[in-house]
Amino acid sequence: MNVKDETFWSVHNLCVNYEHAAVLYHISFSLGKGSLTAILGPNGAGKSTLLKASLGLIKPSSGTVYFFNQKFKKVRQRIAYMPQRASVDWDFPMTVLDLALMGCYSYKGMWGRISSDDRREAFHILERVGLESVADRQIGQLSGGQQQRAFLARALMQKADLYLMDELFSAIDMASFKTSVGVLQELRDQGKTIVVVHHDLSHVRQLFDHVVLLNKRLICCGPTDECLNGDTIFQTYGCEIELLEQTLKLSRGKQFGSC
């Protein structure tokens, strides 16, 4: 198969239940090379669950998931996963540089030796995300936006082809937002595929060329201009797009002022 036509992530009839309640119901879609995709949906829609079930972090009830037309374990070195910030132990005694260097483990293994070249590359990546001045700081001492950028640096060190990012833009300052967007667009232009669980509809058309609309079931997957409309928004969120965007604008102003 031509790499240009390679399917990076394909989900087939995926179902996930928690205590007999359906969280994801027969989800099927696929994403190819070189896209910047947002997974959108209300709280409880199953967005994070979709990532975790695809990566084997939780067990699906049924269905199959393939990355690059293979099971995850065979191609895990080609995939970078960024968890939600709330799931991280920020008291762990690790510096920002140490966190970035963890990205090497995907291709060196847990016991692989970290070389001076690796350290130089990690520091260069920290410069790229604007964290070189806090490289030796313990990760819990960072602001929310800096913490997100530190995990972005770790993902970049993995040199992956597919990036799955759970709420990358949640509760970050505007400087971190702009830096992160620039990095993601560079990756997309290099032929990488980036998937971000996202909440703010007011940014979607400007940032993402593809969307996955989800509310326990798949509403739409495809180019943003084709999928994002009044009908699909109503199916996903249960309200009109104008009201939803007004609410999100107010919450976004509070969000960017809090970091």
UniProtKB/Swiss-Prot annotation:
- Recite the UniProt keywords alphabetically: ATP-binding, Cell inner membrane, Cell membrane, Membrane, Nucleotide-binding, Transport
Q: Which GO terms describe its molecular function?
A: ATP binding; ATP hydrolysis activity
Say yes or no: keyword Membrane present: yes
CDD domains per UniProt: ABC_Metallic_Cations
**Membrane topology qualifier:** Peripheral membrane protein
Residues that hold ATP according to the record: 41-48
Q: Where in the cell is it found?
A: Cell inner membrane
Tell me the InterPro entries matching this sequence: AAA+_ATPase, ABC_transporter-like_ATP-bd, ABC_transporter-like_CS, Metal_Ion_Import_ABC, P-loop_NTPase
ABC transporter domain boundaries:
3-241
Disulfide-bond pairs as recorded: none
**Keyword Transport on this protein?**
yes
Recorded GO cellular component terms are: plasma membrane
Instruction: Tell me, in a sentence or two, what this protein's role is.
Output: Part of an ATP-driven transport system CPn0346/CPn0347/CPn0348/CPn0349 for a metal. Probably responsible for energy coupling to the transport system.
Q: Which family does it belong to?
A: Belongs to the ABC transporter superfamily.
Which PANTHER family does the annotation name? IRON TRANSPORT SYSTEM ATP-BINDING PROTEIN HI_0361-RELATED, METAL TRANSPORT SYSTEM ATP-BINDING PROTEIN TM_0124-RELATED
Under what name is this protein listed? Probable metal transport system ATP-binding protein CPn_0348/CP_0412/CPj0348/CpB0355
Organism, by scientific name, is: Chlamydia pneumoniae
